UniProtKB/Swiss-Prot annotation:
It is found in: Plastid, Chloroplast thylakoid membrane. One of its GO terms (cellular component) is photosystem II reaction center. This is Photosystem II reaction center protein Z. The chain crosses the membrane at residues 8-28, 41-61. GO terms for biological process: photosynthesis; photosystem II stabilization. May control the interaction of photosystem II (PSII) cores with the light-harvesting antenna, regulates electron flow through the 2 photosystem reaction centers. PSII is a light-driven water plastoquinone oxidoreductase, using light energy to abstract electrons from H(2)O, generating a proton gradient subsequently used for ATP formation. PSII is composed of 1 copy each of membrane proteins PsbA, PsbB, PsbC, PsbD, PsbE, PsbF, PsbH, PsbI, PsbJ, PsbK, PsbL, PsbM, PsbT, PsbY, PsbZ, Psb30/Ycf12, at least 3 peripheral proteins of the oxygen-evolving complex and a large number of cofactors. It forms dimeric complexes. It comes from the Eukaryota. Belongs to the PsbZ family. Keywords: Chloroplast, Membrane, Photosynthesis, Photosystem II, Plastid, Reaction center, Thylakoid, Transmembrane, Transmembrane helix.
Length: 62
């Protein structure tokens, strides 16, 4: 169970780093929000899911 928690936290950190870089790039691109909003929504949905997963796994470990 601990390894699953550690992998979930690592995935959350990686996803956060990717979103930190990609969201400003999406808004600065010529297509802007209209062309890339599906990518932003997918990344945000993944991030929210990982936050809940880390919270659930943390409650099971503690």
């Amino acid at each position: 169970m601990t390894i699953a928690f550690q992998l979930a936290v690592f995935a959350l950190i990686v996803t956060s780093s990717i979103l930190l870089i990609s969201v400003p790039v999406v808004f600065a691109s010529p297509d802007g929000w209209s062309g890339n909003k599906n990518v932003v929504f997918s990344g945000t949905s993944l991030w929210i899911g990982l936050v809940f997963l880390v919270g659930i796994l943390n409650s099971l470990i503690s």
